[in-house]
């Protein structure tokens, strides 16, 4: 008779739980980054020649890419979460190709999400470096555009880290379990 801790012959599922948590974080961070950038308040500035100009994120192509790429990455990450939860990631060897297809799709989606989020983040950092004076002109007193650009950039960076770690923990076995395993 055993009291206290239950000993199980099942493999620990800690890596699946950590990977799922990081996937959910990626989804939330990428989507939040896109929303913050898309809702960046407009900024009106007077240029050196006296012309009044309104600046939005759409005036900077890398920011438009950030919004589009992060939304696409969030949708793909939602599909990856669904695949992971509904099929377990296609780890079954006894079903042939049909059993391995979800695992193959998961790898393809992981690569696509990484490419989209890394590209969006890199583009945003490059744009802030290249267009610094124009973005900083919308700093204090001229609206929240500058602050929202920096928030979106950092959220996208955090999403980049989360997606990379999710893929690592998908393949690394962690020696603990976070939810009960099946009692079949």
From Swiss-Prot:
Alphabetical list of InterPro entries matching this protein: CASP/CASPL, CASP_dom, CASPL
Domain of life: Eukaryota
Record keywords, A-Z: Cell membrane, Membrane, Transmembrane, Transmembrane helix
Chain segments annotated as transmembrane: 17-37, 63-83, 101-121, 154-174
Gene Ontology cellular component terms for the protein in this record: plasma membrane
Topology relative to the membrane: Multi-pass membrane protein
Keyword Transcription regulation in annotation: no
Membrane-side (Cytoplasmic) residue stretches: 1-16, 84-100, 175-184
Subunit structure: Homodimer and heterodimers.
Family stated for the protein in its record: Belongs to the Casparian strip membrane proteins (CASP) family.
Protein name listed in UniProt: CASP-like protein 1U2
């Amino acid at each position: 008779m055993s009291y206290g801790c239950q000993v199980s012959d099942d493999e620990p599922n800690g890596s699946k739980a950590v990977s799922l948590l990081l996937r959910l974080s990626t989804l939330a961070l990428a989507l939040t980054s896109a929303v913050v950038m898309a809702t960046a308040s407009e900024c009106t500035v007077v240029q050196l020649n006296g012309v009044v100009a309104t600046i939005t994120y759409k005036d900077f192509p890398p920011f438009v890419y950030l919004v589009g790429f992060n939304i696409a990455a969030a949708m793909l990450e939602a599909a990856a979460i669904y695949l992971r939860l509904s099929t377990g990631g296609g780890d079954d060897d006894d079903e042939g190709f049909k059993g391995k297809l979800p695992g193959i799709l998961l790898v393809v989606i992981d690569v696509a999400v990484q490419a989209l989020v890394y590209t969006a983040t890199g583009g945003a950092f490059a744009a802030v470096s290249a267009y610094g004076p124009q973005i900083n002109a919308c700093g204090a007193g001229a609206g929240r555009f500058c602050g929202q650009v920096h928030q979106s950039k950092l959220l996208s960076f955090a999403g980049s880290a989360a997606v990379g770690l999710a893929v690592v923990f998908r393949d690394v076995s962690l020696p603990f379990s976070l939810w009960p395993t099946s009692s079949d």
